[in-house]
Amino acid sequence: TGLPTGTLRIPAFLMHNYRYVDSRSILKRSCDYVRAELLALIKEHGLPGMPHVKADEVVDIIFTSATELEFWVKTPSRTVTKKELSVSQKLQEQYWQRTHGTVRTALEQAVERLDRYGMVAEMGHKEVGGVKAKLDEDGHEAVVLEQLEIDWKFSNNPLQTADNELQARIIVREVFRENGLDVTFNAKPIIGVAGSGEHTHFGVMAKLKSGKVVNLFSPEDMRKESASSLGIGAIMGLLKHYEAINPFISSTTDSLNRLKPGFEAPVCIVTSLGTDPSEPSRNRTILCGLIRDIDNPMATRYELRSPNPYTNTYTALALIFISAFDGMKYAITSGKTQAQLEAELSKEVGETSDYLDTNRAYRTEKDVFDDFTQEERNQMFGVAPATVWENIKGYQNNPELVETLAQGNAFAKDLMDSFIASILKRWKLVLANRLIPNNLDTVRSMVAIHTDSRNSVDDKRFAEVNDLRFYLAKDSDDRKSLFTRLIDALNDGEYDLASQLQIEMNDKMEELETKYANYAKNIF
């Protein structure tokens, strides 16, 4: 016909029993609720610690947000050893290196296509993971395995931010496939190697009658204070409620596999503001950090580092803004100065607080991984969940936090419970029907490869491997295997036991792979 053809994607809402129940509507309601409540608070109490902003001039609240998309790209049906990846990562051979060949072509095309969709791509670059591409005898790239990141302009509409993130994933995958490359957005596609995050930025601004926009997180003097009273309150609110929020951010085993000590993967509920207001924080080991430019107050925002490419950005932003508002409400109504609020945020473990948990610390300027032991991290910032079930319990065991998050019915309690139920169901299905079968395939593949029975070292090493294989996967008359016990626990609804067995399974599989590699390297 000569007419253009293509796919039209229209973001939509879902109504059930005359009620909107979808993620987009939850985010819209949450922003509408926070906007109305914050405007009312400002009208009644003013803006403490912000004398440069006249409260009676504020006519609207603007929510700024943005996401960063990390992903792995590879040639189909070609493999690279984990050891090669691990060594390259430790040497940081790929971080911010120039892209080459097909990967460069696809990355440039993806950035250009994002621009054509109006997303205003800002940057595409290599991340820490990956190895140098290998060429075949004809000079073509035969093996590609690299980690990349693409960023685009922030939005003043959180719904647009989340819509853009979904659209960007689709575009990136299609462009790289057009160039013969596979893309994965999994949080931890390769255990032991850097995973992919989706750092989520958020801020709150006020529009004045004059049309001017001011950043409510920025203080009057950027060189004397790191953040305004409302900015301090916002991070207090997020950190206080994060245990109940966490299941909505990291809802899968894959996402939790990424959140372990290592390459900038946050494991502790803690923030950093910077050692001095004149020097912005560069701490990349914390959960949520203050991002600021001393010469540009409009740039002040927070960066939540725990989300991954498959995090539901709609519900994540909804809970971020609701929890931040609760802290901002405390900052406005408590009568405390900015210095007092910052001191409260910076309290030590055991120090009482009017808003935060007495038995927690919430701020550090130190490296969370290098400067604290595991025991110190647990004592100061709480124990990070190791499984989806442990994460769900953070929601179930904190009803007072959930009640706050459900305020105004923007994200109603029954909808939260429904999300949690779906997270639990997915955990069980993936564990029983994907992770355990995959581990079983790995166990079956680790067979004896030595033929010289006179070598006692080989015999001993494979005997250790075989003992682990039998413990993990082989039932006998007097003992069930670990895999069987885990499946039984899931079927019986014994989720505490299943969670413990999953942790044991992960540890045993790691031990098995290490022992088998040690055995195999001695074979000629």
Regions found by a protein language model. Give the residues of each.
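Glycine-rich, acidic/polar active-site loops that bind/position phosphate-bearing ligands
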Residues: 1-198, 204-524
